[in-house]
């Protein structure tokens, strides 16, 4: 299974259209982001402590749900 970070990068966009695209752009610039992780708790904990660029954890939860549904096929 590819990492959440790898999945999220498909949403990067020079002119973000939505909150997930903004999240992807910021995660790309965040050198401490757990890039190899596939674990919700690890990424969620990291974002709660370091994800000041994330306006709401709901954005992460929505991106995580997409990740799970698309990578579990």
From Swiss-Prot:
Say which family it is in: Belongs to the UPF0346 family.
Any S-S bridges, and between which cysteines?
none
Q: Which residues form a coiled coil?
A: none
Q: Which organism is it from?
A: Bacillus licheniformis (strain ATCC 14580 / DSM 13 / JCM 2505 / CCUG 7422 / NBRC 12200 / NCIMB 9375 / NCTC 10341 / NRRL NRS-1264 / Gibson 46)
Membrane-crossing residues?
none
Q: Which domain of life is it from?
A: Bacteria
Pfam families listed in its UniProt record? YozE_SAM_like
UniProt-recorded name of the protein: UPF0346 protein BLi02292/BL01432
Q: Which NCBIfam families match?
A: PRK13672.1
Taxonomic classification: Bacteria, Bacillati, Bacillota, Bacilli, Bacillales
């Amino acid at each position: 299974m590819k990492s959440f970070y790898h999945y999220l990068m498909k949403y990067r966009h020079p002119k973000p259209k939505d909150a997930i695209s903004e999240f992807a752009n910021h995660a790309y610039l965040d050198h401490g982001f757990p890039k190899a992780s596939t674990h919700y708790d690890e990424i969620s904990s990291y974002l709660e402590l370091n994800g000041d660029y994330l306006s709401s954890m709901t954005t992460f939860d929505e991106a995580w749900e997409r990740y799970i549904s698309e990578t579990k096929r």
